[in-house]
C-alpha cells in the first residue's frame, strides 16, 4: 500500500489551539499589530515568521519569546480522544507517517516531557525550524513526504488551520480537515473531507476517501 499520512500537530492531534488563540490575542493587546483577527490569521505560521512579520523590534521579540516559553512550559498538552488509537492502527498496518508542525524543537521537547512515547508513532517529525518557508508554503509537506518515501500525491494530510490546509492542497495531497479551529462552513471546500474528531473516524474510513 503506497500511501503515507502527514499530520499537523496543534488542533489536529493535541488540543491546544484555543490556548494559543488566547495567548496570541493577549500578546496582540499588549503589542498591538493593527491586524484584525490576528490570533486566527497567524495560525499555522511558525514563530520566526510571526516575529519577523509583525514584531520587527528586537526588544519586543525577546519579550514575546520569553512569554511564549513560559506559556509553553505551563500548559497541558492534551492529546485529542481517538488520536492514539488512530496512530496505532496506522503503525500496525505499516502505513508510514510524518508529523509536520510549525512548532519548533523546543516546544516539542516540552510535549515529549508530558507524553514520552508520542514521537514513537511517527516515522519522521518535521518541525518549523527544519524548513525555510512556513505554511501556507507547502515545503514542509514535501519534506515530510520525502522523509517517509511517499510522493505527496499519495499522501493524506490532516490539518485544521487555513494556512495548513492551503499548504496541503498545494502539495497535491488529499487533505482531511479537522473542524476544531474553523467552523465547517469556513473550511476550504477543496478539501477531500471534513471530520469533527478521530473518535468516530478510523483508517478504513480514511482509505475510502
Locations of regions flagged by a protein language model:
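Conserved phosphate-coupling serine/threonine residues in phosphotransfer and NTP-handling enzymes
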Residues: 12, 101-103
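Short beta->alpha linker loops
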Residues: 19, 42-46, 81-82, 103, ...
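Asp-based, Mg2+/Mn2+-dependent phosphohydrolase catalytic module
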Residues: 1-3, 88, 104-106, 110-209
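N-terminal helical cap/lid subdomain that shapes the substrate entry/recognition surface
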Residues: 2-93
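Residue-level marker of regulatory loop/turn positions in helix-turn-helix DNA-binding domains and
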Residues: 79, 100, 133
Amino acid at each position: 500500500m503506497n500511501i503515507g499520512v502527514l499530520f499537523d500537530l496543534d488542533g489536529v492531534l493535541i488540543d491546544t489551539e484555543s490556548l494559543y488563540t488566547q495567548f496570541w490575542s493577549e500578546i496582540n493587546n499588549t503589542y498591538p499589530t493593527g491586524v484584525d483577527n490576528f490570533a486566527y490569521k497567524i495560525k499555522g505560521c511558525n514563530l520566526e515568521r510571526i516575529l519577523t512579520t509583525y514584531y520587527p523590534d528586537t526588544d519586543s521579540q525577546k519579550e514575546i519569546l520569553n512569554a511564549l516559553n513560559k506559556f509553553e512550559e505551563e500548559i497541558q498538552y492534551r492529546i485529542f480522544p481517538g488520536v492514539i488509537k488512530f496512530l496505532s492502527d496506522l503503525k500496525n498496518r505499516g502505513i508510514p507517517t510524518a508529523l509536520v508542525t510549525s512548532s519548533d524543537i523546543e516546544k516539542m521537547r516540552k510535549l515529549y516531557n508530558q507524553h514520552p512515547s508520542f514521537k514513537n508513532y511517527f516515522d519522521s517529525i518535521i518541525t518549523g525550524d527544519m524548513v525555510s518557508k512556513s505554511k501556507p508554503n507547502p515545503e514542509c509537506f514535501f519534506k515530510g513526504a520525502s522523509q517517509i518515501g511517499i510522493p505527496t500525491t499519495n499522501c493524506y494530510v490532516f490539518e485544521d488551520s487555513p494556512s495548513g490546509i492551503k499548504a496541503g492542497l498545494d502539495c497535491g495531497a488529499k487533505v482531511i480537515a479537522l473542524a476544531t479551529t474553523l467552523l465547517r462552513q469556513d473550511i476550504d471546500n477543496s478539501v477531500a473531507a471534513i471530520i469533527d474528531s478521530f473518535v468516530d473516524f478510523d483508517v478504513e474510513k480514511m482509505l475510502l476517501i
